[in-house]
Design a protein with these regions (language model features):
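Active-site gating loops and adjacent loop-to-helix segments of metal-dependent hydrolytic enzymes
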Residues: 74-106, 140, 144-147, 215-260, ...
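Alpha-helical scaffold segments that flank or form the walls of functional sites
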Residues: 31, 58-59, 76-140, 162-173
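Active-site glycine- and acidic-residue-rich loops that bind
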Residues: 125, 181-195, 211, 267-270, ...
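Hydrophobic faces of well-ordered beta-strands that scaffold small-molecule active sites
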Residues: 64-66, 123-124, 143-147, 178-182, ...
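Histidine-centered catalytic micro-motifs
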Residues: 61-73, 206-215
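Active-site gating/metal-coordination segments in enzymes
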Residues: 163-206
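N-terminal metal-binding scaffold of metallo-dependent hydrolase/deaminase domains
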Residues: 1-47, 58, 363
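His/Asp/Glu-enriched, well-ordered alpha-helical/loop segment
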Residues: 229, 256-258, 291-292, 301-383
Length: 394
């Protein structure tokens, strides 16, 4: 019997235990203290079996949601599905201030509680304003906020960057982790991307960008054609200065990022092999975020996840916002992938949902792994492949 056995400790095991990088040997037991820190990792034969809680399913570290928009939580069930990205974006612009500040804050608090209940422990969250600060300060979750900037006109890069830095300082004053991020290739000039990326490099913080969420984005960069012309016409923003590049959006913008900082490419729904290979040659710290529920909600299609995996992309998982999703649940995103892309393994997706996400956010020393002397959250996944559910054990 383990000589350290006492009533304060909790001993848990399951059919499988996933560390964040792979599965532990069978009969592994996690020893938790009264603060849910892992004080030891041992085996069944070293413990009095009557003291061990045995669960059916898979134990994992707490999940990392690398892409969310908490400040859009009040738009749940407001925007129609399958409209395409341009009409979705126009609907967000039209409706994002349709509720009182108090109602928006309560929606954010509810979304935060939902994520916690779904086993999420850390979030990479997009913010265009300061409205999420209060909800984040009160949360048990770790948030890294990406203060998102928009300006396709290169002449506006300095002004928008300065406004972004002032907003960034509000999060910093609230003692919330944050850095700048460009919105998307079609809405951020190369000049703005460069300024943001260099600022993140100076601060040693990650950045993020929505990437190839629609094929219209590639049309816009390749030949200055497609649905984004309608977007800019509708919002009455002239884009005479923008010139076609003859390239996909990703190939046109990737060299503007500092290749030494962690950079998240979000969605990648219309990313092909040439795009991936070009990006990987150019940038050595790329992560590729999957948000399948949002992809189905907006464009009704999914990225080629098998291609991303076969080309050694570092995958992470995000929920996107409640404007484009019915719930903020990493396990539900995993279920969607397992249902539609049968060659993808559970192990790959669990690493994407835990260690990879933590590594991207630069919090892998605290989150994303089951290791001795850590308190990274403990989840239990129950059910069968494609129909999993999750509950928090610690």
């Amino acid at each position: 019997m383990n000589k350290f056995l006492n009533l304060v400790m909790r001993y848990i095991t399951a059919d499988q235990i996933f560390s964040g990088k792979g599965f532990f040997p069978s009969h592994t037991v996690l020893v938790l203290d009264d603060m849910n820190t892992i004080s030891d990792i041992t085996t069944l034969d070293s413990i009095e079996k009557s003291n061990v809680e045995h669960f059916k399913g898979i134990i994992t570290p707490g999940f990392i949601n690398t892409h969310c928009h908490l400040e859009l939580s009040h738009l749940k069930n407001v925007i129609k599905q399958h409209t395409g990205i341009v009409d979705f974006g126009l609907s967000v612009i039209k409706n994002r201030n349709n509720q009182s500040p108090e109602a928006q804050l309560e929606a954010m608090r509810q979304a935060d509680r939902e994520m916690r209940e779904q086993g999420i422990v850390a979030v990479g969250d997009i913010s265009n304003t300061n409205v999420s600060i209060e909800a984040k300060k009160q949360s048990d979750l770790f948030y890294h906020t990406f203060v998102e900037l928009i300006a396709l006109n290169p002449e506006r890069a300095d002004l928008v960057f300065d406004v972004g830095k002032r907003l960034l300082s509000e999060f910093s004053k609230a003692q919330l982790s944050a850095s700048l991020a460009p919105h998307a290739p079609y809405s951020a000039s190369l000049e703005l991307i460069k300024k943001i990326s260099e600022d993140c490099s100076t601060l040693n913080k990650p950045t993020s960008i929505h990437n190839q969420e629609s094929n219209a984005e590639n049309d816009f960069f390749n030949s200055k054609s497609g649905d984004y012309l309608r977007l800019y016409d509708t919002i009455n923003v002239p884009i005479d200065y923008f010139k076609a590049t003859g390239k996909s959006s990703l190939q046109a913008i990737i060299s503007s990022f500092n290749s030494k900082i962690n950079t998240l490419l979000v969605h990648n729904t219309f990313t092909n092999k040439d795009d991936i290979e070009n990006a990987q040659k150019t940038h050595s710290h790329l992560y590729w975020c999957l948000c399948p529920n949002a992809n189905l909600y907006i464009e009704n299609t999914l990225p080629d996840i098998a291609l991303l995996h076969s080309t050694n992309c570092q995958l992470t998982i995000g929920t996107d916002s409640l404007a484009s999703n019915s719930q903020l649940s990493i396990i539900d995103e995993i279920n969607i992938i397992l249902k539609y892309q049968l060659t993808i393994s559970v192990e790959l997706l669990l690493q994407a949902a835990t260690y990879n996400g933590a590594q991207f956010l630069g919090i892998e020393n605290k989150f994303g792994l089951i290791e001795k002397n850590r308190n990274s959250g403990i989840n239990l996944i129950e059910g069968t492949s494609g129909n999993y559910s999750v509950k928090k054990l610690a």
